[in-house]
Amino acid sequence: MNPTQAGSFTTPVSNALKATIQHHDSAVIIHARGEIDAANEHTWQDLVTKAAAATTAPEPLVVNLNGLDFMGCCAVAVLAHEAERCRRRGVDVRLVSRDRAVARIIHACGYGDVLPVHPTTESALSAT
């Protein structure tokens, strides 16, 4: 998997996790499906890190969580850690979820400032 390539592709990241990586100008969008838990945390971390590296400031890294059936705390921690790293180089990490519980969890964990949650990919891309 090479998220620096132009276009969009789907890759089975693990048995429980699938992801589509899409380039939108200099932004990168991850569409995650399935489950993220301790069993595939390192795979998730590798995917997020590579996608972040392929994102060019000032465009964002957008992570669409709408296709997830389960997201463990470890997945949120990976996103928060990468958001802090991205912020240092001028890249925002923006989440997409229609599930209000996701925003509540992000805020309860204290990550609301670094992981804003948007209702659509389009709104995440256009946010300032």
UniProtKB/Swiss-Prot annotation:
The keyword Transmembrane helix does not apply. Positive, redox-sensitive regulator of sigma-F (SigF) activity. When reduced binds to anti-sigma-F factor RsbW (UsfX) preventing its binding to SigF, thus activating transcription. Keywords: Disulfide bond, Transcription, Transcription regulation. This is Anti-sigma-F factor antagonist RsfA. Disulfide bonds join 73-109. InterPro entries: Anti-sigma_ant (IPR003658), STAS_dom (IPR002645), STAS_dom_sf (IPR036513). One of its GO terms (biological process) is regulation of DNA-templated transcription. The keyword Glycoprotein does not apply. One of its GO terms (molecular function) is anti-sigma factor antagonist activity. Residues 17-128 form the STAS domain. Belongs to the anti-sigma-factor antagonist family. The lineage of its organism: Bacteria, Bacillati, Actinomycetota, Actinomycetes, Mycobacteriales. Monomer. Interacts with anti-sigma-F factor RsbW (UsfX) under reducing conditions, with a possible 2:1 RbsW:RsfA stoichiometry. Gene3D superfamilies: STAS domain.
